[in-house]
């Protein structure tokens, strides 16, 4: 899984966050796990 503060996509296309939550705001190309 993806560690906190590492890059992610909410749709899971880059893998799943260890925390289960990918934070991505409007306009961002990618989000980050937290």
From Swiss-Prot:
Name by which UniProt lists this protein: Antimicrobial peptide Alo-2
SUPFAM superfamilies: Gurmarin-like (SSF57048)
Annotated localization: Secreted
Keyword Methyltransferase annotated: no
Keywords linked to the UniProt accession: Antimicrobial, Disulfide bond, Fungicide, Knottin, Secreted
An individual GO BP term: killing of cells of another organism
Family: Belongs to the AMP family.
Role, per record: Has antifungal activity against C.glabrata.
One cellular component (GO) term of this entry: extracellular region
Intrachain disulfide bonds: 1-18, 8-22, 17-33
Domain notes: The presence of a 'disulfide through disulfide knot' structurally defines this protein as a knottin.
Matching PROSITE patterns: PLANT_C6_AMP
Keyword 4Fe-4S: no
């Amino acid at each position: 899984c993806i560690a906190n503060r590492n890059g992610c996509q909410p749709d899971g296309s880059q893998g799943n966050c260890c925390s289960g939550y990918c934070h991505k705001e409007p306009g961002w190309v990618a989000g980050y796990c937290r």
